[in-house]
């Protein structure tokens, strides 16, 4: 693994909890090679789809200067998290339907050199369909109707839907969305890998990183990740109802958003669930740390940081003797001191803390971490009798929203 983990104030799981964790692991193993919901994990071992993804990404990179991915939630957050590794910044993921945000982006684009990828598993996601229809009209007005089929690409299920009908009308190339891999669990599918590959990332390394974690978690007896699952279950049963993830790495801000959806939507069911809290060091030391240190003792903490970069910017001149204590320090020195002091004060208060320290940050390392969080979520769900897949409650809101929109036009 390309990161190390340390744990503080985590008790050994109770015997019955440990048994349930092992039963959950067995369930994951049994389902891994099938075509069930566990395909989101098993897909890590697939290779046949990679050529199509790489060929398409190469076509896009050779024919367009920029790509806009239109999706929301699980159709966007995985891609956004992976793209945090990209140095090219040639892909924008548009989640918002805030009129100002959408207008500013679309009006800033060189439409003739921009590709648009719409991602909707159902083909009916209101937000990304709305974005798509608006920018289609802009492309038609500026470049002509025939340009729509050249600039737009769809990723959706292979079934009749409004979006597949639109694709047929305009001859839009369409990729098949995996039927059993959806939403928050889809970063290893073409939903995550197409944008990542367009962004110049190594998609084989992304899949291999996931495999590394799967093999470790499922085949290493009494490993620390499974022990953590047991601790989380016991903490939850004893009143811990908030799950804080706080990286001291700016590029991981999208990881925390992805994790927030993963944890909340998977385990918030039947009157149960813990609240995921996304934070970022050091800024949220100045907004949330007071609560962590002196508020309710109801939180489990995961802090993420990295080894110091020898090329980190250094303070070589202080200009005032009052700042002499900073001379010679790098920004990474200061960041790590801020991190270590935060962890230490929480540990001293006997609060449950996990620390993940990356040796290096790249596609493989990130994917190892993402798969760890996915497996932890699935295993904790199975061990507590919660189905970690599906999100039946939110379907009610989607149906209501469509009814309200239809009524608005009457």
PLM regions: where:
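Extended, charge-enriched "interface" segments that sit outside catalytic cores
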Residues: 1-58, 317-326
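Acidic catalytic cores of enzymes that act on phosphate-bearing nucleotides/polynucleotides
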Residues: 201-203, 215-345
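Structural beta-sheet core signal
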Residues: 69, 116-118, 154, 245, ...
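A short, well-structured juxtamembrane/interface segment
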Residues: 45-61, 224-235
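C-terminal amphipathic alpha-helical interaction region
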Residues: 386-410
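Hydrophobic alpha-helical scaffolding
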Residues: 92-95, 125, 153, 157, ...
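Short helix-loop-beta junction
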Residues: 82-90, 138-141, 262-273, 345-349
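Glycine-rich phosphate-binding loops that contact phosphosugars or nucleotide phosphates
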Residues: 58-220, 399, 403
């Amino acid at each position: 693994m390309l990161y190390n983990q340390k744990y503080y104030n985590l008790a050994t799981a109770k015997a019955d909890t440990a048994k349930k964790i092992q039963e959950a692991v067995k369930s994951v193993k049994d389902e891994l090679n099938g075509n069930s919901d566990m395909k989101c994990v098993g897909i890590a071992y697939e290779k046949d789809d990679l050529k199509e993804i790489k060929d398409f990404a190469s076509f896009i990179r050779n024919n367009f200067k920029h790509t806009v991915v239109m999706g929301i939630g699980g159709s966007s957050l995985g891609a956004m998290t992976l793209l945090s590794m990209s140095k090219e910044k040639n892909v924008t993921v548009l989640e918002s339907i805030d009129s100002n945000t959408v207008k500013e982006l679309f009006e800033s684009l060189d439409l003739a050199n921009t590709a648009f990828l719409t991602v909707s598993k159902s083909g009916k996601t209101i937000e990304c369909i709305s974005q798509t229809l608006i920018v289609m009209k802009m492309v038609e007005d500026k470049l002509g109707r025939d340009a729509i089929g050249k600039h737009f690409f769809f990723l959706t299920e292979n079934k009749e839907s409004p979006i597949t009908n639109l694709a047929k009308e305009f001859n839009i190339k369409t990729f098949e969305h995996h039927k059993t891999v959806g939403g928050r669990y889809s970063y290893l599918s073409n939903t995550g890998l197409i944008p990542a590959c367009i962004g110049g990332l190594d998609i084989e390394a992304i899949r291999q990183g996931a495999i590394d974690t799967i093999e470790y978690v499922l085949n290493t007896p009494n490993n620390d990740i499974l022990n953590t699952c047991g601790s989380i279950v016991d903490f939850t049963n004893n009143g811990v109802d908030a799950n804080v993830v706080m990286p001291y790495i700016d590029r991981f801000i999208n990881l925390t958003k992805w994790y927030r959806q993963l944890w909340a939507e998977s385990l918030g069911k039947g009157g149960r669930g813990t609240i995921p809290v996304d934070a970022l060091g050091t800024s949220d030391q100045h907004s949330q740390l007071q609560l962590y240190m002196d508020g309710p003792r109801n939180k489990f903490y995961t802090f993420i940081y990295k080894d110091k970069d020898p090329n980190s910017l250094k303070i070589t001149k202080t200009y005032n003797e009052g700042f002499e204590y900073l001379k010679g320090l790098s920004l990474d020195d200061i960041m790590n001191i801020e991190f270590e002091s935060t962890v230490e004060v929480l540990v001293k208060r006997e609060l449950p803390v996990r620390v993940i320290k990356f040796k290096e940050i790249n596609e493989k390392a990130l994917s190892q971490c993402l798969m760890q969080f996915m497996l932890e979520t699935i295993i904790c769900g199975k061990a507590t009798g919660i189905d970690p897949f599906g999100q039946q409650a939110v379907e009610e809101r989607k149906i209501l929203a469509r009814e309200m929109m239809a009524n608005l036009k009457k």
